[in-house]
From Swiss-Prot:
Organism: Homo sapiens
UniProt xrefs under SUPFAM superfamilies: Annexin
Family to which this protein belongs: Belongs to the annexin family.
InterPro entries, per the entry: Annexin, Annexin_repeat, Annexin_repeat_CS, Annexin_sf, ANX3
Positions where Phosphothreonine occurs in the chain: 267
Name of the gene this protein is made from: ANXA3
GO molecular function terms attached to this record: calcium ion binding; calcium-dependent phospholipid binding; calcium-dependent protein binding; phosphatidylserine binding; phospholipase A2 inhibitor activity
Name under which the protein is recorded: Annexin A3
GO biological process, one term: phagocytosis
Amino acid sequence: MASIWVGHRGTVRDYPDFSPSVDAEAIQKAIRGIGTDEKMLISILTERSNAQRQLIVKEYQAAYGKELKDDLKGDLSGHFEHLMVALVTPPAVFDAKQLKKSMKGAGTNEDALIEILTTRTSRQMKDISQAYYTVYKKSLGDDISSETSGDFRKALLTLADGRRDESLKVDEHLAKQDAQILYKAGENRWGTDEDKFTEILCLRSFPQLKLTFDEYRNISQKDIVDSIKGELSGHFEDLLLAIVNCVRNTPAFLAERLHRALKGIGTDEFTLNRIMVSRSEIDLLDIRTEFKKHYGYSLYSAIKSDTSGDYEITLLKICGGDD
C-alpha cells in the first residue's frame, strides 16, 4: 500500500541495497567517541527515505538500547541538531510536534498553523491528530481551541478534523451553487457570513474549489482573492487566502513560504526545516521549480547564501540539486 506521506515529486527516495543494521552500526560509530563524524551522519540520513530511517531507529534501539534521536540531541547542536532529529521523526509525529511548538509559550505562530493545516490531506490530518494525542495526551482540537479564537479557530478546527473531501470528481452544479453562496455571503450582503466561507473552503475538494472559484469570477466579476481581502480580516483572512493559494498551486504557496523564511536578516529555520523535511518525499521538485520561476534564482542558491556549515550541507542534500 502506498504511503500517504510519499508523493511522486520528492527529492528523497528509498535507498537501494538498504540495510538497517549496517546503517545503525555506521551511525553509532559516527556518534561514539571523541568528535562526531557529521559527514557520515548526513550521508546516511539524507539518502534514506523516512520509512527506511524508521527501520534504522528500530535497529539502533535494539542494538544499543538507546533512542537514536536522543543520541543525536546529545551529540549535535543548534539548527543542525533540529534538522537531523526531524529527519528521524515519523512524518505525523513531526507535524504534531510542529503544531505543538506553534502554540506553545507566549504568542501563537499562526503562520505555521495555517501552513500545516492547509497543505496536509485529510488522511494525513487524521494521522497527525492521532500522533498529537499519543505524544501530548491532549487532543489537537483542544489546544487549537485554547490558543485561537473566533472564525479563525472555527476554520482551523474544521481543517484539523480531516474532513475535506478528497475525491477528484467535480460537480459543476455544486460549484455554481457554492459560488452563489459565497457571493451572497460576502460581496452581495451587508456584513459577511463567515461560516459559509469556512464550510465551503475547508470541506470541498481542491479540484471542486478550483471550479467554484472560476464560477465565482463569472458571477461576481471578481477573483475570490479580492473578495476575501475586501470582506475578511486578520488570521481568518490569511487562512482562507492560504487555502485559495494551495488550491491553485500548493508548490508555489510553499515556495513563497521558503522565500520568506530565507529572505532578509536571519533565517526562519522553524519554517525552513519543516518545509524541506515534510515535502522532501512529496513535491520538493515542484517547489524548486516554482521557486526559480517566481524569484529568478534557485532554492539551492538561496539556501547556500543564507545558511552555513553542516546545517547548510544537510539542507542542500535534501534540496537535491541546483536549478
